[in-house]
């Protein structure tokens, strides 16, 4: 019998970055446990961690490429697959030009070094403006507000949960999400610690979520009105002279404009809009201002709504007004060991962030951070004319489940001339592909959370080497992406990928040696490249990024600093300390100051103000739809693993008892939910955890499409809530509106199923 060995690695399935101890017997995964010695998670783990074993054993996980022949996806060699890509992609590019090909990058890409480090070369080789990602059905409003205020899209202040005394949470459920735009394992333990040290946790949410149940208090709020509430809190702080930004006042522009914008949003003006009494709003404001250390934190419920950017902006306005921005126990800027733009070069001045540099062809929606709103992808495919999308590349994404008006996108994708997907499953989206290129399983890939450490409450660095060898003939994921780039660049399926990898690292080195303030400023690029040795691929890039990062050894400048070699010798990670104040150096705005009221955001305030006098969604008696997170799900990509779908049906319509009685709904019965975009039927769950007038359906389900090859997911199909989502967007960011959707709800008398979209 083979000897058992234990491998330590970071879990790649959510933002918490928990350390795991994976016991192997040869190629068999024996067990997955929490790593008690991990410097960040200290043994904490959640059920998703078991996905490492179950994904390894999943017979539906693709291990060989698929090519469409005679209408069917069949196994092919890697050479045949790339030849098919070269022919199909080349044809679309040749006939329609660069913008005829669109790219969609899904959420799992953020957890994998291949897409994180090599996605940019692919996008540059394609040269298309039709770039889409899960960001515009998720966090884009926060990136836009942070970028415009502080100068970089990932300069997102995160709550210093380990040192705060008062945490106000809106539209977030970190006990289930494990923290989002907030990397901090064991959020339950961290929130409990706030209360144990005499602090307070306040949750504002249309659902009494698991986090709300652990909080000191919970307030229901009408979906989509968070910005009204936040403005009212700002109004109280200013009117009662409770605002005290402290040292940050000398680093900020337009404080007077913020006061002017907040003036109409009195507690009395907004109480009917948001459903929270004026006296309660005043108390929330006074307690926030009175706490020794306080932070405001908001997440997906506030970003996937009509006023997502305004709500995201106002969170940081409140942190500023209360003197808690960039302060211990407040909301602070993380300092990552690698790949963080706001820690490279010299602050506080920089180029800042521009949005709307180009517009989508059909609806004229503006670009954000180099991509277009995915809510417009269907119309870009379906609408004839110059620049019509005729080809699609998807990487680790399932947009036919994850994006709004999914029915329209499903119809549009069927008309494409060519589609290629990098994915481990034939799912609702990839079943339409002409070529599917499987990525290796997580245990066969190196791992470093280059993206998520930029949002972590402590500066942590943890490298995970591959546990398993790649199957014979299987390329690395980064090699697959580079070969797609070479094909897009016209070099064909047999291009020299090693040369592409060299180009990537040489570009990074060249940029860094020319960067004022870099530890290798002015050094010889050849010397730096030689110092990286024989490493290739992500290992070489991460080694380089860590060495030139804020804790790095700087290629000899600080012999005690970090390198990949040091990380390899530290299997439980290296803790580099808590967050620290970083203003003004963290700023990258052209002014070198905090822009408290960016014009792009201030211009959207009249739209919000108009709702003070109007009726607003949900104020006329109609039902309003919201989503919900689930601990054993991560969007649409964990549902083929038995351990994560076992138990009772989780894809239900949650409804308040008063509404259930009025609508004639029964526990365990079926409800038909319809919107302007579509209709579905799902099981009813009656609970007083939901606000009256609101219904909730989790996202990421609906796995009953013909052609899917995910047997477990199909047996627990659920319904796709995005059939109900319109193509409406938050104006400044282009983010989809997935919460606060007006719907009609009625009893149904048929089995739970997704019904064809009506739009």
Predicted regions and their residues:
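Catalytic, metal-anchored helix/loop core of enzyme active sites in primary metabolism
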Residues: 434
């Amino acid at each position: 019998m083979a000897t058992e060995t234990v491998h330590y690695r970071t879990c790649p399935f959510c933002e918490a970055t928990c350390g795991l101890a994976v016991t192997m017997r040869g190629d068999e995964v024996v067990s997955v446990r929490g790593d008690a010695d991990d410097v960040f998670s200290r043994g904490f783990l959640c059920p998703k961690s078991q996905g490492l074993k179950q994904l390894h054993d999943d017979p539906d996980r693709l291990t060989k490429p698929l090519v469409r022949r005679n209408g069917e996806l069949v196994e092919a060699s890697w050479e045949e697959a790339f030849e098919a890509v070269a022919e199909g992609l080349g044809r679309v590019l040749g006939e329609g030009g660069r913008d005829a090909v669109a790219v969609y990058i899904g959420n799992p890409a953020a957890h994998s070094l291949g897409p994180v480090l090599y996605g940019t070369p692919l996008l540059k080789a394609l040269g298309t403006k039709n770039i889409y990602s899960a960001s515009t059905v998720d966090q884009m409003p926060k990136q836009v507000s942070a970028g415009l205020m502080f100068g970089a899209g990932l300069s997102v202040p995160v709550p210093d949960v380990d040192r705060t005394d008062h945490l106000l949470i809106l539209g977030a459920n970190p006990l289930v999400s494990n923290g989002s735009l907030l990397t901090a394992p064991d959020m339950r333990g961290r929130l409990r610690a706030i209360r144990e040290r005499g602090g307070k946790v306040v949750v504002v949410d249309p659902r009494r979520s698991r986090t709300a149940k652990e909080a000191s208090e919970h307030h229901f709020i009408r979906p989509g009105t968070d910005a009204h509430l936040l403005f009212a809190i700002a109004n109280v702080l200013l009117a009662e002279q409770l605002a005290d930004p402290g040292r940050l006042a000398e680093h900020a522009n337009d404080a007077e404009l913020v006061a002017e914008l907040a003036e109409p949003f009195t507690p009395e003006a907004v109480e009917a809009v948001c459903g929270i009494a004026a006296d309660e709003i005043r108390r929330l404001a006074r307690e926030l201002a009175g706490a020794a250390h306080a932070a405001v934190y908001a997440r997906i419920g506030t970003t996937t709504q009509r006023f997502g950017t305004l709500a995201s902006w106002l969170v940081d306005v409140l942190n500023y007004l209360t003197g808690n921005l960039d302060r211990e126990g407040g909301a602070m800027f993380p300092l990552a060991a690698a790949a963080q733009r706001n820690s490279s070069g010299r602050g506080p001045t920089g180029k800042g962030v521009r949005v709307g540099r180009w517009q989508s062809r059909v609806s004229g929606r503006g670009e954000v951070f180099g991509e277009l709103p995915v809510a417009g992808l269907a119309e870009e495919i379906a609408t004839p004319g110059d620049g019509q999308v005729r080809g699609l590349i998807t990487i680790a994404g399932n947009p036919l489940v994850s994006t709004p008006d999914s029915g329209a996108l499903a119809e549009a994708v069927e008309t494409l001339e060519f589609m290629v997907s990098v994915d481990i499953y034939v799912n609702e989206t990839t079943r339409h592909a002409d070529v599917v290129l499987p990525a290796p399983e997580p245990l066969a890939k190196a791992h470093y959370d280059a993206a998520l450490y930029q949002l972590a409450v402590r500066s942590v660095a943890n490298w995970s080497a591959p546990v398993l060898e790649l199957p014979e003939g299987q390329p690395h994921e980064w090699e697959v992406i580079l070969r797609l780039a070479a094909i897009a660049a016209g070099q064909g399926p047999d291009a020299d990928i090693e040369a592409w990898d060299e180009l990537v690292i040489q570009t990074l080195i060249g940029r860094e040696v020319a960067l004022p303030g870099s530890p290798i400023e002015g050094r010889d690029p050849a010397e730096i490249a030689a110092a990286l040795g024989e490493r290739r691929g992500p290992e070489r890039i991460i080694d380089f990024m860590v060495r030139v990062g804020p804790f790095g050894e700087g290629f000899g400048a600080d012999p005690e600093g970090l390198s990949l070699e040091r990380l390899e010798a530290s299997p439980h990670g290296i803790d580099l300390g808590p967050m620290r104040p970083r203003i003004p150096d963290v700023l990258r705005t052209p002014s070198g100051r905090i822009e408290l009221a960016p014009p792009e955001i201030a211009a959207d305030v009249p739209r919000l103000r108009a709702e003070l006098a109007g009726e607003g969604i949900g104020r006329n008696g109609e039902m309003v739809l919201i989503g919900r997170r689930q601990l054993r799900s991560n969007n649409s990509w964990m549902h083929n693993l038995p351990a994560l779908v076992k138990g009772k049906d989780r894809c239900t319509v949650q409804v308040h008892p008063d509404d259930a009685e009025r609508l004639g709904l029964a526990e365990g019965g079926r409800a038909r939910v319809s919107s302007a975009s579509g209709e579905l039927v799902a099981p009813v769950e009656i609970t007083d955890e939901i606000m009256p007038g609101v219904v909730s359906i989790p996202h990421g389900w609906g796995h009953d499409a013909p052609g899917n090859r995910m047997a477990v997911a199909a047996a627990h199909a659920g319904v796709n809530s995005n059939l109900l989502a319109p193509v409406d967007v938050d104006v400044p960011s282009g983010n989809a509106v997935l919460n606060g959707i007006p719907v009609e709800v009625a009893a149904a008398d048929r089995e739970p199923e997704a019904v064809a979209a009506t739009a």
